[in-house]
């Protein structure tokens, strides 16, 4: 066979294989005017290499992969920290940052390595569009046999440029001095006017957020894991959950002796679900995501077993299970509803926020699959969010096309109206957060339906109950939510309890058909903080509605 035909044959073969195992993926990568095949690249995770940053060398990667998106290019990352030299070959979207850097050479046919800033050592990166072009890494694009070009700049030109250079430097120095002086002046004014009693010390807030006393994992163990580069000594116990992409095991994380261990949860993805594992790993790896109402992440691992390659996510274990299971088995009190609902809202509010409680910038994240089975119940009866396999980071660099390609995802029963009919406002990233708020409202309804404060408590049933089948499709939910404008029923008996009445008013605003009319998760969290003392409410909620003494609520939309 001619050598030129081998990459094409491999590409078509892999495409047929992927298309047969994932029809949805094949559909996404087709166009109206015919089939457009994605790029083939070398795809090996970070590993040790003998390749030096001189001349050129081979990646020695034996894995060829089809890129997930048509616009992705081949890329390579070479790093040297102390005496360790590593190489990573991947597919990469050139419109996104890779390790904090934008790659401006994605149109190149060859992988020409360029040095990038890296606090931990030396780093070179490249990107290219050729077939498996990241297999050969070129560290020097200069021909050593080509003579150096003579400097044609005359002395007159150099002399004429010197005054301009001096003036430019002077302007820069003056501007910098002015900005520094202005900044110091503003800082002094801020320190003078701020009232310390209204602000917690940043270190105190961070300590509260990062040291989760209600987790089943000790802080010492978690700290050691975060700095461990070897596979953890884990013994799988029993399966405690199973979803579309992975199975969840209760497991033992062994300590110094065989008698000592920590109980952890291990979410195991098969080889075919690498993309879901990577999405969730990337979400969890954001240090600014840590929050008491978001599942505590320990580490991610790639493991080789007798069944093939597996991808693991290791997290804290919560014995009470997910919220759906808990509500099925238990009737809750008003105080339980207040704790569960308030903690759920706080977790979603942190997920959606663009800053941490300490004020550090943070990329907002939308969950996109909020439901009671994706929420865990902790020992203190507060919630924590989990299962971020469909989540999306709302990076400002994302274009409308990027957002459009994110697709219609989630569980049909919990999908917002605009998601069901694929009519989201992609120009406004807040629209993604509004879909999470709709789903949150349905979960709050589930909690309320099992609260003994409403009187007689019926058996647990999910939102829309018997109106749809157990696993409804999108078309079935369209009939209920769009055509009939249906929502879960709120019996009049629920309104006899002042606190539950206010919860109902809140969730009705959250599942409004108009996304712009819905509350934010932060607003819901603030309301729940007031609901604890519902019988004493006489002020305003975060949406500025008046709450009369008789307990009735008039909502201002």
From Swiss-Prot:
- May I ask which residue range the UniProt record assigns to the signal sequence? 1-23
Record PTM: Phosphorylated on a Ser/Thr residue in the cytoplasmic domain.
Q: Which residues are glycosylated?
A: 62, 84
GO terms under cellular component? activin receptor complex; caveola; external side of plasma membrane; extracellular matrix; membrane; membrane raft; plasma membrane; receptor complex
Principal location: membrane
Q: Is Transport one of the keywords UniProt gives this record?
A: no
Expression tissues: Detected at low levels in embryonic heart, brain and lung. Detected at high levels in hatchling heart and lung.
Q: Mind telling me which InterPro entries this protein's record contains?
A: Kinase-like_dom_sf, Prot_kinase_dom, Protein_kinase_ATP_BS, Ser-Thr/Tyr_kinase_cat_dom, Ser/Thr_kinase_AS, Snake_toxin-like_sf, TGFB_receptor, Transform_growth_fac-b_typ-2
- Which residue spans belong to the Cytoplasmic compartment? 177-557
Keyword DNA-binding attributed:
no
Which residues are connected by disulfide bridges in this protein?
41-74, 44-61, 51-57, 67-91, 111-126, 128-133
**How does the record say this protein sits in the membrane?**
Single-pass type I membrane protein
Ranges where the Protein kinase domain occurs: 234-537
Its keywords, alphabetically, are: Apoptosis, ATP-binding, Cell membrane, Differentiation, Disulfide bond, Glycoprotein, Growth regulation, Kinase, Magnesium, Manganese, Membrane, Metal-binding, Nucleotide-binding, Phosphoprotein, Receptor, Serine/threonine-protein kinase, Signal, Transferase, Transmembrane, Transmembrane helix
Q: Which residues bind ATP?
A: 240-248, 267
Report a single Gene Ontology molecular function. activin binding
Where is it located? Cell membrane; Membrane raft
Q: What's the Enzyme Commission number for this chain? A: 2.7.11.30
Name the residues that span the membrane.
Answer: 156-176
Q: Which residues are annotated as active site?
A: 369
Subunit structure and binding partners: Heterohexamer; TGFB1, TGFB2 and TGFB3 homodimeric ligands assemble a functional receptor composed of two TGFBR1 and TGFBR2 heterodimers to form a ligand-receptor heterohexamer.
Entry-linked PANTHER family:
TGF-BETA RECEPTOR TYPE-2 (PTHR23255:SF55), TRANSFORMING GROWTH FACTOR-BETA RECEPTOR TYPE I AND II (PTHR23255)
Explain the purpose of this protein.
Transmembrane serine/threonine kinase forming with the TGF-beta type I serine/threonine kinase receptor, TGFBR1, the non-promiscuous receptor for the TGF-beta cytokines TGFB1, TGFB2 and TGFB3. Transduces the TGFB1, TGFB2 and TGFB3 signal from the cell surface to the cytoplasm and is thus regulating a plethora of physiological and pathological processes including cell cycle arrest in epithelial and hematopoietic cells, control of mesenchymal cell proliferation and differentiation, wound healing, extracellular matrix production, immunosuppression and carcinogenesis.
Tell me its family: Belongs to the protein kinase superfamily. TKL Ser/Thr protein kinase family. TGFB receptor subfamily.
Q: What is this protein called?
A: TGF-beta receptor type-2
**Origin organism lineage:** Eukaryota, Metazoa, Chordata, Craniata, Vertebrata
